[in-house]
């Protein structure tokens, strides 16, 4: 794909248009390379969240620890919950929001897109909030798109810093030596 895309979702759209010009696939899952510990259940839950309601795209969250809440590399999601495991996104931020006694949720950077919604998304320029927070999903929210949220128990290990990369290498080496 081109190297000048403003977001991963823009890159995914280019890839799916190249791979599937006949548009056989109507849903696209965008799984991030910086989440090497993604469990096999994640794509299934992401697809189920996308299928659950009238929504443009879906993503996942998990309860945030106090340490995660304080880290700007951990994106927090504000969610309007419809039940214990399903809701709609209201906002995403690198800040610890919402304040108060409400539980904080760690956004997992995976997306399930309806193909038509992804096409609408990539036709939009990066939005002011997207540029301020450096979070692509804010472009969708600012455009009035609906983001369904599924809840998982724990976050997969992500790589946001050099320390995260070293920890991932150690996990991979330990797993390799088990085999």
How would you name each of these model-derived features?
Residues 30-32, 60-61:
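Short beta-strand segments
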Residues 1-7, 72-74, 169:
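One-carbon transfer enzymes
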Residues 1-31, 37-45:
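Short phosphate-binding loop-to-helix
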Residues 102-179:
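Conserved alpha/beta core of the MobA/IspD/sugar-nucleotide pyrophosphorylase nucleotidyltransferase superfamily
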Residues 17-21, 51, 173:
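Residue-level signal for alpha-helix termini/capping positions
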Residues 4-9, 66-67, 156-158:
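A short acidic, often aromatic-flanked loop/helix-cap motif at beta-alpha or helix-coil junctions
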Residues 38-127:
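Conserved core of the sugar-phosphate nucleotidyltransferase
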Residues 23-25, 52-56, 145:
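Short, high-confidence coil segments that cap the C-terminus of an alpha-helix
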């Amino acid at each position: 794909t081109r190297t000048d895309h403003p977001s991963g979702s823009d890159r995914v759209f280019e890839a799916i248009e190249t791979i599937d010009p006949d548009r056989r696939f109507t849903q696209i899952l965008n799984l991030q390379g910086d989440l090497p510990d993604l469990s096999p259940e994640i794509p299934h839950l992401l697809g189920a969240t996308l299928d659950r309601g009238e929504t443009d795209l879906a993503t996942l969250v998990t309860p945030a620890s106090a340490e995660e809440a304080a880290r700007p590399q951990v994106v927090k999601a504000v969610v309007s919950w419809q039940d214990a495991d399903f809701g709609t996104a209201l906002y995403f931020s690198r800040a610890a929001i919402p304040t108060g006694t409400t539980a904080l949720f760690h956004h997992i950077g995976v997306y399930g897109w309806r193909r038509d919604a992804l096409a609408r998304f990539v036709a939009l320029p990066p939005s002011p909030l997207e540029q301020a927070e450096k979070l692509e999903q804010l472009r969708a929210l600012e455009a009035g798109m609906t983001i369904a949220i599924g809840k998982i128990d724990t976050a997969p290990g992500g790589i946001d810093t050099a320390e995260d990369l070293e920890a991932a290498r150690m996990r991979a080496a330990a797993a390799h030596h088990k085999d």
